[in-house]
């Protein structure tokens, strides 16, 4: 199955011996290797802690072409990468192509949060994660998305299981990462590590509530967009 969303830069980077040797080292030294799709450092922190304390060897895969704008994407990715480096956990950097992601959700722009647009978004990200797991020869993958109270677990599960059907040799670890005190621990690690705490889910379609915030409370690189968004909402227009 070919997909325009498969991270080509990531695929070429996997040819490097350094990455393979690092992942192989983790896989052979631990009981259970697992690929963790990560949306950000805060959502990954408690999950990574739990995994490493319970006999798992996580490799983090960062593939989130939904995040808007590019500066926000880089902020989240760089922080996640730095945190993995601090913990000594392998980090795989997927491609960022927001324009292609927009094609995947075309026609769903006005869907509410937790609606069909989110399901399509999960499909893109879970397929790329399954392909990454297959290439790294890691059977099981899971995602930090299943730790968010703002996401529907049934949509995530459906997207992941579809990805498994398209990617032989992989298995989705259907774990509810909200349970077991992990939500509380996430908050503790957020404060302890001084993580950047984002104000919106990721894509531009999840930014509507930001129009109610004072401009000075927003990152400088989204203020103009949020202003345009507020004007578009007042006129019932499509997002810029």
Which residues are covered by each model-predicted region?
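Nucleotide-activated chemistry modules centered on ATP-dependent adenylation/adenylyltransferase
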Residues: 28-240
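Glycine-rich phosphate/adenosyl-contacting loop at the front of the ribokinase-like
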Residues: 8
């Amino acid at each position: 199955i070919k997909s325009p969303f498969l991270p080509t830069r990531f695929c070429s980077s996997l040819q490097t011996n350094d990455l393979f040797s690092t992942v192989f080292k983790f896989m052979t030294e631990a009981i259970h290797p697992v690929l963790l799709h990560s949306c950000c450092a805060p959502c990954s922190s408690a999950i990574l802690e739990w995994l490493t304390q319970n006999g798992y060897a996580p490799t983090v895969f960062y593939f989130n072409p939904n995040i808007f704008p590019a500066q926000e994407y880089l902020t989240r990715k760089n922080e996640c990468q730095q945190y993995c480096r601090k913990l000594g956990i392998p980090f795989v950097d997927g491609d960022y192509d927001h324009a292609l992601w927009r094609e995947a959700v075309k026609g769903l722009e006005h869907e509410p949060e937790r609606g069909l647009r989110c399901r399509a978004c999960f499909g893109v990200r879970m397929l790329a994660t399954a392909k990454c797991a297959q290439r790294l020869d890691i059977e099981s993958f899971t995602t930090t998305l299943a730790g968010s109270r703002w996401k529907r677990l049934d949509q995530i599960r459906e997207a992941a299981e579809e990805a498994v059907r398209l990617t032989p040799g992989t298995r989705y670890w259907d774990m509810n990462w909200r349970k077991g005190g992990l939500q509380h621990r996430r908050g503790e690690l957020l404060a302890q590590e001084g993580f950047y705490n984002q104000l919106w889910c990721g894509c531009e379609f999840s930014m509507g509530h930001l129009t109610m915030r004072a401009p000075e409370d927003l990152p400088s690189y989204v203020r103009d967009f949020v202003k345009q968004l507020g004007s578009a909402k007042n006129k019932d227009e499509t997002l810029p």
